[in-house]
Amino acid sequence: MVSVKYVPSDMLINYVSGKLKEEKKIKEPNWVKFVKTGVSKEKPPLQDDWIYVRAASMLRKLYINGYLGISRMSSEYGGKVDRGSKRYHAASGSRSITRFLFHELESAGLVQKTQKGRSLSPQGMSLLDNASKEIIKQLAQKDPLYEKFI
């Protein structure tokens, strides 16, 4: 069985975000084009489909970490605040975006609420496992080193 940990993260996130966009599991709100993703950012993201990429990245983080709450998940997407010549100061990402995506992923059946935070549901696990299988098959066609994972 191929685990998400053995698949290159950029390929997995792009594949899963394409699946989420294609199956319309997440409703794209109106504010997506205008919102910043955190206090440390000056402008909104340049990608048009960044909300799907963020959702796929959140699913991958939940797969690897087991469970995460809104606060810890938003700190994963933080950065450093531009304070001029003053020292570095860490800032977390937008909690409202994280909360919105958790609600959307819960309504799609990919994430479930637990006592310790949010975790992947069996549907979410199977989505990521199937995606990693497909990616490993594609990589095995290009490079024979990946055939041992099939």
From Swiss-Prot:
GO terms for cellular component: cytosolic small ribosomal subunit. Belongs to the eukaryotic ribosomal protein eS19 family. The keyword Transmembrane does not apply. Part of the 30S ribosomal subunit. InterPro entries: Ribosomal_eS19 (IPR001266), Ribosomal_eS19_archaeal (IPR027548), WH-like_DNA-bd_sf (IPR036388), WH_DNA-bd_sf (IPR036390). Pfam families: Ribosomal_S19e (PF01090). It comes from the Archaea. This is Small ribosomal subunit protein eS19. Keywords: Ribonucleoprotein, Ribosomal protein. One of its GO terms (biological process) is ribosomal small subunit assembly. May be involved in maturation of the 30S ribosomal subunit. NCBIfam families: PRK09333.1. GO terms for molecular function: RNA binding; structural constituent of ribosome. Gene3D superfamilies: Winged helix-like DNA-binding domain superfamily/Winged helix DNA-binding domain. The gene is rps19e.
